[in-house]
């Protein structure tokens, strides 16, 4: 049935005029270009860090996402206390926020917040392959797609931006290394670092402000004109300085003006409110890569203690019976 439909479509296409064929081909190219552009914009946020920094965690412990997301907000990370080698386990990432609030989008309009995170694992730990995941864990993960920070750093995972209302809590499926096959890994306690954000950043990687930021006056003087710019919003604020010069501060669509015409202002005085409602946070946890031989040794040790205690109790009862018999005699 499907083959017949395909043949019919091809036959109909061959009967079209050359002009119609060109129009269809043009629409096809336009659709592909649009999808590529949209997907590139959506996936751009993690790329900022990936392209600009070889390692997302600086020497002082700060995760580089904080360079663009200036406000501090809490995040939570939950992992098992210990895992055995070559074992699949899950990490729970929580990015809490009030889901009723709206953020300023790039076009100046209000919309829901998105979230994103970077998870820095110990060397050897990485994303668990899908064929190793139990069905229950697959359901918890859902449609989330985690990707390595780079081809050489599979122990660093990133995701985002994704809808915060759906994914403010994320389950990350992980697999532990096996020191028997990976000589760079030892049975030790390791740290895991998390960086998570909700909402858009206030700065771009080049240091320029986004429209999700506070805008200040660049000079001291009097506001002589406030001119709307474009259909999407934004303003040009004309300031006449004390020496008679004219300075124009541009405010993009999004932030709300808190100054008026003929108002006297000082340099660095806020011209707008701070529209940012999101923020970035860091958390860390520790996990022990447990040696199975140690676990077995501990179990044997505990069993030995239990048997020893049992024999002591039995011996005590035996002695008590002998003493009781001697007293009766």
Curated annotation (Swiss-Prot):
Q: Which UniProt keywords apply?
A: Chloroplast, Electron transport, Heme, Iron, Membrane, Metal-binding, Photosynthesis, Plastid, Signal, Thylakoid, Transmembrane, Transmembrane helix, Transport
- Membership in a protein family: Belongs to the cytochrome f family.
**What highest taxon heads this organism's lineage?**
Eukaryota
Q: What job does this protein perform?
A: Component of the cytochrome b6-f complex, which mediates electron transfer between photosystem II (PSII) and photosystem I (PSI), cyclic electron flow around PSI, and state transitions.
Q: What is this protein called?
A: Cytochrome f
- Where does it reside? Plastid, Chloroplast thylakoid membrane
Its lineage reads: Eukaryota, Viridiplantae, Chlorophyta, Ulvophyceae, OUU clade
Report the transmembrane regions from the record: 295-315
Q: Name one GO cellular component term.
A: chloroplast thylakoid membrane
Per the record, the gene is: petA
Q: Which InterPro entries match?
A: Cyt-f_TM, Cyt_f, Cyt_f_lg_dom, Cyt_f_lg_dom_sf, Rudment_hybrid_motif
Q: Which residues form the signal peptide?
A: 1-44
Q: So which cofactors does this thing need?
A: heme
- GO BP of this protein: photosynthesis
The topology of this chain with respect to the membrane is: Single-pass membrane protein
Q: Its Gene Ontology molecular function terms?
A: electron transfer activity; heme binding; iron ion binding
Which organism does this sequence originate in?
A: Tupiella akineta
Binding annotation for heme: 45, 65, 68-69
UniProt cross-references to Gene3D superfamilies, sorted A to Z = 2.40.50.100, Cytochrome f large domain (2.60.40.830), Single helix bin (1.20.5.700)
Cofactor note text: Binds 1 heme group covalently.
- Subunit-level organization: The 4 large subunits of the cytochrome b6-f complex are cytochrome b6, subunit IV (17 kDa polypeptide, petD), cytochrome f and the Rieske protein, while the 4 small subunits are PetG, PetL, PetM and PetN. The complex functions as a dimer.
């Amino acid at each position: 049935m499907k083959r017949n439909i395909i043949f019919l479509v091809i036959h109909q296409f061959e009967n079209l005029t050359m002009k119609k064929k060109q129009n269809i081909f043009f629409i096809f190219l336009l659709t592909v270009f649009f999808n590529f552009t949209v997907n590139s914009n959506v996936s751009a946020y993690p790329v900022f860090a990936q392209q600009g920094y070889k390692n997302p965690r600086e020497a002082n412990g700060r995760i580089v996402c904080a360079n663009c997301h200036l406000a501090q907000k809490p995040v939570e990370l939950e992992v098992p206390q210990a895992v055995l080698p070559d074992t699949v386990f899950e990490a729970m990432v929580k990015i809490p926020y009030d889901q009723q609030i709206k953020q300023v989008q790039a076009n100046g309009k209000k919309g829901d917040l998105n979230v994103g995170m970077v998870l820095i694992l110990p060397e050897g730990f990485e994303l668990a392959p899908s064929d190793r995941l139990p069905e229950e864990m697959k359901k918890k993960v859902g449609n989330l797609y985690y990707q390595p920070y780079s081809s050489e750093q599979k122990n660093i995972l990133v995701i985002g931006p994704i809808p915060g209302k759906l994914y403010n809590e994320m389950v990350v499926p992980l697999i532990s290394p096996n020191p028997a096959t990976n000589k760079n890994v030892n049975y030790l306690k390791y740290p895991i670092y998390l960086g998570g954000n909700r909402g858009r950043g206030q700065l771009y990687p080049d240091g320029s402000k986004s429209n999700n930021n506070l805008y200040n006056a660049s000079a001291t003087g009097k506001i002589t004109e406030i001119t709307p710019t474009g259909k999407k919003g934004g303003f040009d604020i004309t300031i006449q300085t004390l020496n008679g010069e004219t300075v124009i501060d541009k405010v993009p669509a999004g932030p709300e003006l808190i100054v008026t015409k003929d108002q006297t202002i000082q340099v660095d005085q806020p011209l707008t409110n701070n529209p940012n409602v999101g923020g970035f946070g860091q958390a860390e946890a520790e996990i022990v890569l447990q040696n199975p031989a140690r676990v077995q040794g501990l179990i044997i040790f505990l069993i030995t203690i239990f048997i020893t205690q049992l024999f002591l109790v039995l011996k005590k009862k035996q002695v008590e019976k002998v003493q009781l018999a001697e007293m009766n005699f």
